[in-house]
Amino acid sequence: MVKFEKYQGLGNDFIIVNEKELIEKGIPDYNEFAALVCDRHFGVGADGLLILKYVANMPFMFYYNSDGSQAPMCGNGIRCFAHYIKNNNIVEEDTFVVKVVPGDLTIETHQEEEGDFWAKVNMGKPIFNVNKIINSNKEELI
């Protein structure tokens, strides 16, 4: 059994797991694992899988789509990941950095007394030039 937590941000839901869990359980193929656990009929069901790794002693978020493909980033996912990090006392500060495939992201968080959690992430300027978009599937972009 793999320990995980499930979070939701603006209607997108994510399974979040620490990579240590996957290593301890002998799960080497994260793409296959993502497809299995994200399956809404036979798995837990989610839009994606977020895996916490550590790089240079900093939290690193790896994102997998529900079909098992890896993507460089997910906007709603990073906010849910920030909530997971705070809930699990991985960082103490309200402002912290998380590494993702495209680079480091600074996240500002706030926990309200009523329980609402807020995360603000500057993901940089949007890219509209299709020649500069990361295309991990190597498909032709129109």
Descriptions of predicted regions:
Residues 1-115:
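A glycine-rich beta-to-alpha transition motif near the start of alpha/beta enzyme domains, typified by
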Residues 90, 99-142:
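ATP-dependent small-molecule kinase catalytic core of the GHMP/sugar-kinase superfamily
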